[in-house]
Every structure is written in C-alpha cells, then in structure tokens.
C-alpha cells in the first residue's frame, strides 16, 4: 500500500469507499471485514499476501519450444474476439476493454473500444498478459478460474492498487463435456460499474459455447 493512499477518494460512492476501507484495514494487518468482503475475495487476498504475490504484467505466456498451435486457444481468440469486437462497436461511446483468456488466465485476446481516447485507468489492463492470481492478484478472472462461475470485482476488491480505479466482469467458457476451457470478460472504470456488464460477459460466454 502506497504512503499516499487515501480511501476518501471514493467518497461519492459509498460502496467503493467501503471496499477501500476493508482493503486498507487488511493490508495493515487488521483482519478481514466479512460484512464488506466476500469469502472468495477474502481468501484470495490471503493467498496473495501469504504468497507475497508481486504484480507481474507479462506473466508466463511463452509456449514450449516446438509446441503445436493450440486449436482451442485459436478458436477462442477468433470466435470470442469477433463477438467482443461486435459488442465494443455497439458500446462505442463508453470506455471498455474486452478480454478472452485461457482457463488459467493467460490473455488470448484483448481489445479496447476507445483507441482514440483510451482511459488512463484502463491502460494498465491492456498491458496485462496473465490475469491468474499468481501474476495479477485478486481480479475477476482469477476468481472465475477459482470458482468456475461468473464473477465481478470493483475497486479495492482487487488486491493490487493498479486495479482500484476499475471494475471487471468475467464468465467461464465450458466445453461440451463441461470442462472450463477459457474465460471472457470486460473491464471499465469503477465509476461506470454496473451489473448489466456481467450479463454481457455471460451472453458472450454462452454464444462461444454454442459455437463449439
């Protein structure tokens, strides 16, 4: 936690400010506030702290030398990527970053709908190549990977401060035999968080599954 940390910057949004207070208390060793932070997020915070996780934007994204192209990943990138592009075109007046990952959180596809005026808060999301908990701490993709169900994280529900101005929404993608093969989601700035975004992530997930 930075020395200049100030939880009052979200004073106009009590929900986000509550997350900030819970996070700052946890980071100071004052325990978890279970009235504000869910069990899944609290457990993820504890794993990050106990494992001394450091933010790793690049992650471990390289394939094994000589490894054949993963047709499943190619399918997710092409099919899911096109669906995300279509949605972001419809959201042209807003600020979103759409993402497809593998089942572990490695980014396969990423796209913003605000190329001409890309939000400074979203720039860091575009740089992340691996959303697994071990590389990016607590985030919507790491929690989907852990729980195998749609998840949203907003503001200081994330473990790392670079996410605190953002809200993320992600859903799992399952194969025909019910194995999770990837994840799809969207990030926006926290002030524009809304549960309808999670419904879009679920809709894309189901459309991808129907294309398998």
Task: Label every PLM stretch briefly.
Residues 1-126, 184, 190-212:
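Intrinsically disordered, low-complexity terminal regulatory regions
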Residues 67, 138-139:
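Acidic, low-complexity proline/glycine/alanine-rich linker and hinge segments
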Residues 81-82, 151-155:
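Short Pro/Gly-enriched beta-strand edge/turn motifs at strand-loop
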Residues 87-88, 141-142, 157:
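A generic local secondary-structure boundary/capping motif
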Residues 91-93, 137, 164-166:
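Short solvent-exposed loop/turn micro-motifs enriched in small/polar/acidic residues
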Residues 132, 137-138:
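A gly/proline- and charged-residue-enriched helix-loop-helix capping module
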Residues 139-151:
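Soluble sensory domains of the PAS superfamily and closely related sensory modules
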Residues 153-190:
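Extended hydrophobic
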């Amino acid at each position: 936690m930075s020395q200049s940390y100030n939880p009052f910057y979200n004073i106009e949004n009590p929900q986000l400010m509550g997350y900030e207070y819970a996070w700052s208390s946890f980071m100071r060793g004052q325990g978890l506030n279970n009235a504000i932070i869910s069990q899944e997020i609290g457990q993820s915070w504890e794993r990050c702290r106990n494992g001394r996780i450091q933010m790793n934007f690049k992650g471990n994204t390289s394939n094994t030398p000589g490894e054949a192209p993963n047709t499943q990943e190619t399918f997710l990138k092409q099919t899911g990527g096109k669906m995300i592009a279509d949605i972001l075109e419809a959201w042209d007046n807003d600020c979103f970053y759409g993402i497809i990952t593998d089942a572990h959180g490695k980014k396969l596809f990423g796209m913003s709908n605000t190329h001409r005026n890309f939000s400074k808060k979203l720039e860091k999301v575009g740089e992340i190549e691996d959303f697994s908990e071990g590389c990016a701490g607590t985030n919507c993709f790491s929690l989907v990977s852990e729980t195998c169900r749609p998840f949203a994280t907003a503001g200081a529900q994330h473990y790392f401060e670079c996410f605190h101005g953002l809200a993320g929404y992600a859903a799992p993608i399952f194969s025909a035999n019910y194995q999770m093969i990837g994840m799809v989601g969207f990030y926006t700035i926290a002030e524009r968080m809304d549960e309808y975004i999670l419904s879009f992530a679920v809709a894309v997930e189901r459309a991808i599954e129907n294309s398998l």
